[in-house]
Structure formats: structure tokens, C-alpha cells
From Swiss-Prot:
Protein name: Phosphatidylserine decarboxylase proenzyme
Family to which the UniProt record says this protein belongs: Belongs to the phosphatidylserine decarboxylase family. PSD-B subfamily. Prokaryotic type I sub-subfamily.
Membrane topology value: Peripheral membrane protein
PANTHER family per the UniProt record, alphabetical: PHOSPHATIDYLSERINE DECARBOXYLASE (PTHR10067), PHOSPHATIDYLSERINE DECARBOXYLASE PROENZYME, MITOCHONDRIAL (PTHR10067:SF6)
Domain of life: Bacteria
Annotated source species: Escherichia coli O45:K1 (strain S88 / ExPEC)
Length: 322
């Protein structure tokens, strides 16, 4: 009964206005009131402040500063094996496994479309059909910066407007096509392990999604798909990130979805749904034994990137950001 009521609220409540209100409040400097809210949050969610670079809650001027607090370097050591891809976020694995052609598992008995997740871009989807996916849920108590599983060179970023449903276990089991419906930022990288997508999914009360190379992607929420591309290889204009390096952050809540090409990686055997994740711990292992740190990522051809753009029925060329 209670779960049915919670689900009903997901459809009834004005999620966009709640999210805007939360974002506004979380960015305000309110002195003692800010500290009180942070202290109550820490107590309620049992946040481990000993891991933070600034463990004193009085040192945060806004709730957002607290929420995206950096951790001490030593608390999240990065696995240095060049054959190992590491976890991109602190949280819990919602689902993981093989992408069955165009189907990704959302929850037991519920699938959603790979192509829909990628905003109808069937050529980008072709890179990952029958590949591997991992969905990581970040709870309110978790560290909310997102890091790189491996070295990567950014090739494309797409902002997809959408709903703002919560992305917890209850909604994943009951809201059809949840991750393909919600607002999200799709980041496509060239890596030593083939193409990799890292997708930051928004949710109710998620005030903003940011990346280290472009800053705040949303808000504003303009209701249009936006797209940016970068050249292949390392050059003055490229965005090259190292394994374990921060790539983005959420200001409140949400989910990260990783997509890997078929035949390139094997997920760590011990991982399963509801496994706890910590940044830097092993997530997957290369199917090729002798990957070196200096291996050159295989770039996607420029014409393929452009073809992906043309293939997406949801993109308005006049409004693209290239």
C-alpha cells in the first residue's frame, strides 16, 4: 500500500518545480541554517564525514558545496592494473550484464531499449549491441562525483531532456523505461578497450548535472537535445581523461550507466545486483591480456560521429551545439 502511494506521487507531484526549488535552496548561503540542514542530513543518512577533505560541516557555505564534497585521496585508491577498469562511482549496482541486442535490464522482468537510452541514435547503439552494461545507483549518503573507469578521449556529449522520476529501487521496478525517459547526459569516449559510454541520469531533486570539461550542462532545462563533438586522438582541442580522474558530478541523487562494446571486457565475477561500489575498485577486466597504459585508443571515424547525429530522429539540427 505504501509503495503504491509512493509510486502515485511520482506521477502526481510537480517534479520539475520541486527540482528547481531544491536546486535553488541548495545553492543559498544561509549560515547557521545551512549547517543545521547539513548536520541533520549527515545524521539521517549516516554520511561518513571522516572520508571528506573537510570533515567539519561548518566549513561548507552551501548545501551544494557539502553534497559534492571532495574526498581525501587515500580513501579511494585506484587499481593500477592496466587490464582493469574501475568503478566510476560510490553507490550500489542496480543491474549489470549483457546487452541483449537492443535490450538492457532495468529490473527483474523489465527491460528498456538501448537505442531509446541513446536518444534514438541507432549508429551509436550499434557500437554497444550485445555488449556489456553496468547501472550504478548513487544514494543520498554517497559521494556524488563520477570518475573514469579507464583512460579515455571524449568524442561526443549529448544532453537529452526528459522526465525527472526518482531512480531508486522502487521506481526501477515499476516505472517502464525509466532510464530512457529521464533527463540524461551521454558521454562517448574512445578507450583502450574500445568505445565506452558513461551516461549521467537525472532524477527528482537533482539540481544539476556537471562535467569537468563543460561545467553545468543542466539547468537550464530548455527541452531540446544538444550535442557536442570532439576530434579523435590527443590534440589541443581534445578532452583526455585518466583512469580514476573525475569526469562529472551530480548536485543531489541519481544514477550512472556504463556501456562497453561487445567482446572487450568481462565484468568482475563477484559483482551482482545490489553489490556496493567504491570508486577505484575493479569493475571489469580486459578480454585482451596485454593492454598497456600507453596503448592508443581506436578512434571512431569522424564520418561515423556525423552519421550518428544524422541518424537520431530526436535532434533538431538548428538547435544542436557543435
Amino acid at each position: 500500500m505504501l509503495n503504491s502511494f509512493k509510486l502515485s506521487l511520482q506521477y502526481i507531484l510537480p517534479k520539475l518545480w520541486l527540482t528547481r526549488l531544491a536546486g535553488w535552496g541548495a545553492s543559498k548561503r544561509a549560515g547557521w541554517l545551512t549547517k543545521l540542514v547539513i548536520d541533520l542530513f549527515v545524521k539521517y543518512y549516516k554520511v561518513d564525514m571522516k572520508e571528506a577533505q573537510k570533515p567539519d560541516t561548518a566549513s561548507y557555505r552551501t548545501f551544494n558545496e557539502f553534497f559534492v564534497r571532495p574526498l581525501r585521496d587515500e580513501v579511494r585508491p585506484i587499481d593500477t592494473d592496466p587490464n582493469v577498469l574501475v568503478m566510476p562511482a560510490d553507490g550500489v549496482i542496480s543491474q549489470l550484464g549483457k546487452i541483449e541486442e537492443d535490450k538492457i535490464l532495468q529490473a527483474k522482468g523489465h527491460n528498456y531499449s538501448l537505442e531509446a537510452l541513446l536518444a534514438g541514435n541507432y549508429l551509436m547503439a550499434d557500437l554497444f549491441r550485445n555488449g556489456t552494461f553496468v547501472t550504478t545507483y548513487l544514494s543520498p549518503r554517497d559521494y556524488h562525483r563520477v570518475h573514469m573507469p579507464c583512460n579515455g578521449i571524449l568524442r561526443e556529449m549529448i544532453y537529452v531532456p526528459g522526465d525527472l522520476f526518482s531512480v531508486n529501487h522502487l521506481t526501477a521496478q515499476n516505472v517502464p523505461n525509466l532510464f530512457a525517459r529521464n533527463e540524461r547526459v551521454i558521454c562517448l569516449f574512445d578507450t583502450e578497450f574500445g568505445p565506452m559510454a558513461q551516461i549521467l541520469v537525472g532524477a527528482t531533486i537533482v539540481g544539476s548535472i556537471e562535467t569537468v570539461w563543460a561545467g553545468t550542462i543542466t539547468p537550464p532545462r530548455e527541452g531540446i537535445i544538444k550535442r557536442w563533438t570532439w576530434p579523435a586522438g590527443e590534440n589541443d582541442d581534445s578532452v583526455a581523461l585518466l583512469k580514476g580522474q573525475e569526469m562529472g558530478r551530480f548536485k543531489l541523487g541519481s544514477t550512472v550507466i556504463n556501456l562497453f562494446a561487445p567482446g572487450k571486457v568481462n565484468l568482475v565475477e563477484q559483482l551482482e545486483s545490489l553489490s556496493v561500489t567504491k570508486i577505484g575498485q575493479p569493475l571489469a577486466v580486459s578480454t585482451e591480456t596485454f593492454v598497456t597504459p600507453d596503448a592508443e585508443p581506436a578512434p571512431l571515424p569522424a564520418e561515423e560521429i556525423e552519421a550518428e547525429h544524422d541518424a537520431s530522429p530526436l535532434v533538431d539540427d538548428k538547435k544542436d551545439q557543435v
